[in-house]
From Swiss-Prot:
Organism whose genome encodes this protein: Homo sapiens (Human)
Subcellular location: Chromosome, Centromere, Kinetochore; Nucleus, Nuclear pore complex
Subunit structure, interactors included: Component of the Nup107-160 subcomplex of the nuclear pore complex (NPC). The Nup107-160 subcomplex includes NUP160, NUP133, NUP107, NUP98, NUP85, NUP43, NUP37, SEH1 and SEC13.
Lineage: Eukaryota, Metazoa, Chordata, Craniata, Vertebrata
Modified-residue entries (N-acetylmethionine), positions: M1
Source organism superkingdom: Eukaryota
Name the record gives this protein: Nucleoporin Nup43
């Protein structure tokens, strides 16, 4: 892998996301967005990675990500998702959800739409109104789903002023993250270790399914769905463990993998190469997990060298559906094959790595050390 380039940006980065490429595009990712937190003024920023890796006049590598534009954001940026190539949805610690529009002609960002009281502990009409942080957002054009510390789930549509659907008491605990399973179904994770599946076709405020690790109430902070196999999801939480779940099978994780030494803040399957998975943590580490079957012959081990991990435990999930033509490598339960190569991607640990995103050969991450790291050659 080529060097991973750092840029110090004088703000703690809470979220970063690559701008999606047009369908069928052969380009590599060039533009990413960041959101900041815990600063006197927080910003949503757009960056270009430009002519990366060109030799500069001193013969060194130039890895300076260029700031295209930014805009002030009220409150900490709790989550960030591209809605399409021009619009970015931001979740705020104030409970507000904002859609920002990028104007490429003059490189500016403007507020396109806003739901100011999406999340709250006591209602906007109450004299004791108190907002609640919006903790997570997921987009599937034209829909935007948000979750919050108030245990509320909102379904918004772009260009609609009001929520299309709200599940007021979806959870008695904090909802930390949300992802789409299939179009009408979402999956949430909460602060008592539960995964809940919600079907927007059903009326009422009850989840269609609840999964959790028996006896374990460790808060879950992040979730991602396998891009090709929608029943496979990965979660991470306060104990740093990586859990792989098959939502068709029982209520327990299929695999539990010992991972980081502190909270896992984000987990992402690679969108086009999902045998590769990436995690980041409060402990200052950023890891690449490789579950591809050809690990011994792999030609692309990273500089720091990998370390192997074995599955800690399995539930009996290999009895049903084995006739599937493709069984995800993440669901393999053959002990002889249970080897996963883990590689640390950052040269040294510092403060918390809060966020990461991967697209094609490109990875970006952001830290509390006020740094953004980018590489364009993940697999070479």
């Amino acid at each position: 892998m080529e060097e991973i380039y750092a840029k110090f940006v004088s703000q703690k980065i809470s979220k970063t996301r690559w701008r999606p490429l047009p369908p069928g595009s052969l380009q590599t990712a060039e533009t990413f967005a960041t959101g900041s937190w815990d600063n006197e003024e927080n910003y949503i920023s757009l960056w270009s990675i430009g002519d990366f890796g060109n030799l500069d006049s001193d013969g060194g590598f130039e890895g300076d990500h260029q700031l295209l534009c930014d805009i002030r954001h009220h409150g900490d940026v709790m989550d960030l998702q591209f809605f399409d190539q021009e619009r970015i949805v931001a979740a705020s610690s104030t409970g507000c959800v904002t859609v920002f529009l990028h104007h490429p002609n003059n490189q500016t960002l403007s507020v396109n739409q806003q739901w100011t009281t999406a999340h709250y502990h006591t209602g906007p009409g109450s004299p004791s109104y108190s907002s609640a942080p919006c903790t997570g957002v997921v987009c599937n054009n034209p829909e935007i789903v948000t979750v919050g510390e108030d245990g509320r789930i909102n379904l918004f549509r772009a260009d609609h002023k009001e929520a299309v659907r709200t599940i007021d008491n979806a959870d008695s605990s904090t909802l930390h993250a949300v992802t789409f399973l299939r179009t009408p179904e979402i999956l949430t994770v909460n602060s008592i270790g539960q995964l809940k599946i919600w079907d927007f076709r059903q009326q009422g405020n009850e989840p269609s399914q609840i999964l959790s690790l028996t006896g374990d109430r460790v808060p879950l902070h992040c979730v991602d769905r396998h891009p090709n196999q929608q029943h496979v999801v990965a979660t991470g939480g306060q104990d740093g463990m990586l859990s792989i779940w098959d939502v068709r099978q029982g209520t327990m994780p299929v695999s539990l993998l010992k991972a980081h030494e502190a909270e896992m803040w984000e987990v992402h399957f690679h969108p086009s190469n999902p045998e590769h998975l990436f995690t980041c943590s409060e402990d200052g580490s950023l890891w690449h997990w490789d579950a591809s079957t050809d690990v011994p012959e792999k030609s692309s081990l990273f500089h720091q060298g990998g370390r192997s991990s074995t599955f800690l435990s399995h539930s009996i999930s290999n009895q049903a559906n084995v006739h599937q033509s493709v069984i995800s490598s993440w669901l393999s339960t053959d002990p002889a094959k249970d080897r996963i190569e883990i590689t640390s991607l950052l040269p040294s640990r510092s403060l918390s790595v809060n966020t990461l995103d991967v697209l094609g050969p490109c990875l970006v991450c952001g830290t509390d050390a006020e740094a953004i790291y980018v590489t364009r050659h993940l697999f070479s």
